[in-house]
């Protein structure tokens, strides 16, 4: 677990933390089962999560004010996981929030500015880092003003994973295999992949021709 936390990095947040806001962390909590959202007509007031940790179902602390007038529960399917967020930050408050998953979107919750969507377009922010594996989502973080505004920021942790399985065409290219399987360098706590070999157009054409010839030979051997 220690190495996992060391390699995670923050993306976002939507919103902004002031010096008097309280920070909250749900780092490493990627097995989210439910998200509880409390809000009123103006802003998101409180957020809370339930998740599985070491085989046990755990409910997090409440992050924000308990003054919400409306409540929604986002229940994720067993094979559903968070991939991103979108929302609006207006007058020091998160006034709209949508959770993105591999199966769609949940929200928006609140939409409380009173202005048209076209007017608020410049204030909308989306966090989308193309997460396509549950392991890449590393939990949430954010801040809140408990006395007045509720939730003032929210972002996600991302945990890079590396898939070392090349495609069938790539498996025939030794230069690709060499570059693809290099161990990433850690720079300022963020894994940085080495520049991968990119063959010239003529080399790619000849490589594909060689691949086709090899496949034809295999088919011929099989038929014989």
Curated annotation (Swiss-Prot):
UniProt name for this protein: Jacalin-related lectin 24
Domain Jacalin-type lectin: 8-160
GO molecular function, one term: carbohydrate binding
Keyword Transcription regulation appears in the UniProt entry: no
Gene source species: Arabidopsis thaliana
The family this protein is said to belong to: Belongs to the jacalin lectin family.
Keywords from the UniProt entry: Lectin
SMART domains: Jacalin
């Amino acid at each position: 677990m220690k190495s996992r936390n060391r390699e995670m990095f923050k993306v976002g947040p939507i919103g902004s933390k002031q010096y008097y806001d309280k920070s909250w962390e749900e780092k490493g909590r990627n097995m989210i089962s439910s998200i509880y959202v409390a809000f009123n007509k103006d802003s998101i007031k409180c957020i809370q999560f339930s998740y599985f940790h070491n085989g046990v179902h755990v409910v997090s602390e409440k992050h924000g004010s308990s003054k919400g007038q409306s409540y929604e529960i986002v229940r994720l399917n067993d094979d559903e996981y968070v991939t991103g967020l979108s929302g609006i930050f207006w007058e020091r408050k998160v006034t709209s929030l949508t959770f993105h998953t591999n199966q769609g979107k949940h929200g928006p919750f609140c939409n409380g500015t009173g202005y048209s969507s076209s007017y608020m377009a410049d204030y909308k922010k989306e966090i989308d880092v193309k997460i396509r594996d549950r392991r890449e989502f590393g939990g949430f973080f954010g801040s809140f003003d408990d006395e007045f505004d509720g939730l003032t920021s929210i972002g996600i942790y991302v945990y890079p994973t590396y898939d070392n399985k090349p495609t069938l065409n790539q498996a025939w290219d030794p230069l690709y295999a060499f570059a693809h399987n290099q161990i990433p360098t850690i720079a300022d706590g963020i894994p940085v992949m080495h520049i991968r070999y990119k063959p010239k157009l003529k080399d790619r054409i000849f490589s594909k021709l060689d691949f086709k010839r090899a496949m034809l030979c295999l088919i011929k051997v099989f038929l014989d």
